[in-house]
């Protein structure tokens, strides 16, 4: 076996080994601490990357909105959150694939209705809501409202737990409470509870019916158009222009009659009385 053949075989083995390792890698996982995906400005948030590291290499790649950051630790600390920190975060280790994105929202206000995930839930999922105040200022007489109606009241601020979500829990939520002597309310958060399975590759029946109707109307219109065109061509082919025969007899007859009348008038004018 030649040196080139041996080298080529070794390279192929390395490539196969690398491909096999990449195929066997698991995704890294990003978690939030605290768990809330919605926070207020100046809150402290820690993102943790859970993945596999090779011996002696604990470096981590962090991406914010797709751009590589300077952070290389497994823990990504945001000491005082700002609006610019909002967005998607992903991480990757040497022996882990790129994680799924985790979305962080940073808001400005006195109160914020917090959730532990984006506000779309499956039926049966638990839902946790928290009426969070800026810089953890004490809040009293807290009311959680759904579609403008009071759902739960707490004299002292507490989380609202929905153990098994149903479609009846879908709607617009917000919270309000007393901070100092002032009544404050959070922004409205739309929560959806439903079937999150992959949608069918077939369009809904009403879309199918609409498309069939449009196709039928187009076909009828096309047939009528060509029928009319064919009828017009046939009518044109069957039409014969009538022959026109011109005769000079009436004209000649008129001229002769005028000559005869002129002669008669002349003869009458030459009477003896006029001579």
From Swiss-Prot:
GO biological process, one term: antibody-dependent cellular cytotoxicity
Annotated ranges, domain Ig-like C2-type: 28-92, 101-192
Top-level taxonomic group: Eukaryota
Disulfides per UniProt: 49-91, 131-175
Chain intervals with Basic and acidic residues compositional bias: 242-261
Residue intervals annotated with topology Extracellular: 24-207
Sequence positions bearing Phosphotyrosine: 239
Post-translational modification, as annotated: N-glycosylated. Phosphorylated following receptor ligation.
Topology feature Cytoplasmic, residues: 229-275
GO cellular component: external side of plasma membrane
Keyword hit for Transit peptide: no
Places the protein is found: Cell membrane
Self-association and partners: Forms a heterooligomeric complex with ITAM-containing signaling subunits FCER1G. Interacts (via transmembrane domain) with signaling subunits; this interaction is a prerequisite for receptor complex expression on the cell surface and intracellular signal transduction. Binds the Fc region of antigen-complexed IgG.
Protein name per the record: Low affinity immunoglobulin gamma Fc region receptor III-A
Organism: Cricetulus griseus (Chinese hamster)
